[in-house]
Amino acid sequence: MTREQSARLLPQKPSRWAKILLNRKVPILLFLLLELAFLVFSYLSLQEHFPSIILWEHLLSVFTFFYLLNRSMDSRSKLSWVIIIALFPIFGTALLYFSLADLGVRRLKKRLEDATVQASDYLSTDPEVADYLSQSDRQLQRLAYFLEHSPAQFPIYRDTEVTYFPLGDDMLPALLEDLKKAERYIFMEYFIIDEGIMWGEILAILEEKAKAGLDVRVMFDGMNEMTTLSYDYIERLHKVGIKAQAFSPVKPILSTYYNYRDHRKITVIDGQVAYTGGVNIADEYVNKRERFGHWKDTALRLDGSAVQTLKALFLTMWTVT
């Protein structure tokens, strides 16, 4: 299967001119530039009509500098902000407070926290596993305790077979074979999905399974709609029976919302088999296309009860998206 053939497993994309006219990038970038220009114009107008505002801005920058020094924050982030404010006092201060305000994100965080709490009710460590660790390896027991009592509350599992793939090239055949064996559902969540040979082979199976009545869901980061996928890709997936969502899609509004991206790479099949790791769904990850030389990213295949955690992670994100 060639890259050109695999990219056409879904209905043909719009023509070149239609794509240019309907591309979401154009209006989104235009609106963002207009918003930025409005903010700059408003600021310059204030300076012109109220010269004393400059003094207050510098005083605010000094206050912000000391506020940063006493704030609980990663030292590298703190240093970065200090440098920005030192070089660009007014712009840096405004940018910091805009970032801290997290406009448009608080409701998302609340929904994610609530969904995580609900998911944790279904995930718990088997007491026998904890007893086994306490008797076999104290170091592993401490690590397990840390994971179980972390904010995410990851349970510990024992009866799970793990297969390591040193390359995406090694992972793909196994993934395709497991997808073909699916009987109930397939959940896929990826940071990058790019049309090509890899996605074409996966998509052919997903479409077949969806027609057979399986629950097939695909979720990708919203930035894909600006980079690798067409603006109507979710609708095109729906037409072939695949449920699809984009996490944090880019909209024509200035917001720190866009800092929150979904970098997960997860496939869950029937709650029994799962894949995760660093391999996205794009041809360079399986060396079907050379982009930056020979591409190396690793992946894991899980077969057993530990898959339940990955299933919960997927459904949690699916619920809040």
Please report, for each region that a protein language model flagged, where it lies by residue:
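N-terminal localization/anchoring segments of enzymes in phospholipid and broader phosphate metabolism
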Residues: 1-321
